[in-house]
Amino acid sequence: YYCSMKKLLLILLCLPLIGLTQSTNNNSINWLELAEAERLSEKSSKNMLLFFYRENCEYCEKMKSQTFIDPSVIKLINDNFFPVMINGKSKDPIIYNKEEFINDKPNSEDEPYFHNLFKKLVEMKNDNYYWPTIVIVNGEKKKIIQGSGFWPKEQTLRNLRSIVK
């Protein structure tokens, strides 16, 4: 009897922790590593959502602090995409589609350099790159759409819903 009471007490103590971890996952976007998102999208009908940002970017921070915290945006992204956050000016090599991409000009913060993966997936707009940029890629690594600049909640929902079938 004493042993079963201890087990029951242990279960009751753990239940709130299980609920807490599940609710935490629903309150934020489940950002993945690129390799994991690639693996999952190859086996699924879900596309990857690649969010390219850079440090000290006002609009990138607005996306993170305003758009990506909205419950309806979180649900739409978590339910329909494999999201990945990528620093478009990273100095680290990035493996994508079994190919290594580097930043071949990692100069000072003032230099207009970009990671080669960013340059491969993001098309210039009016002879410029804009931050942040969202690129939707399917499991065959084909780009479906790209959108640049700050997207408020309504625009994010509208743009992403147009992709989800």
Regions found by a protein language model. Name each.
Residues 2-8:
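Positively charged n-region of N-terminal signal peptides that target proteins for export
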Residues 8-17:
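Sec-dependent N-terminal signal peptides
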Residues 18-26:
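Bacterial Sec-dependent signal peptides at the C-terminal "C-region" and cleavage site
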Residues 30-48:
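A short beta-strand-turn-helix
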Residues 44-58:
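Short active-site neighborhood of thiol/selenol oxidoreductases, capturing the structured segment around
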Residues 54-59, 67, 88-93, 141-142, ...:
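Solvent-exposed loop/turn segments at secondary-structure junctions
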Residues 55-62, 133-135:
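C-type cytochrome heme c attachment motif
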Residues 71-74, 78-144, 163:
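Thioredoxin-like thiol-disulfide oxidoreductase module
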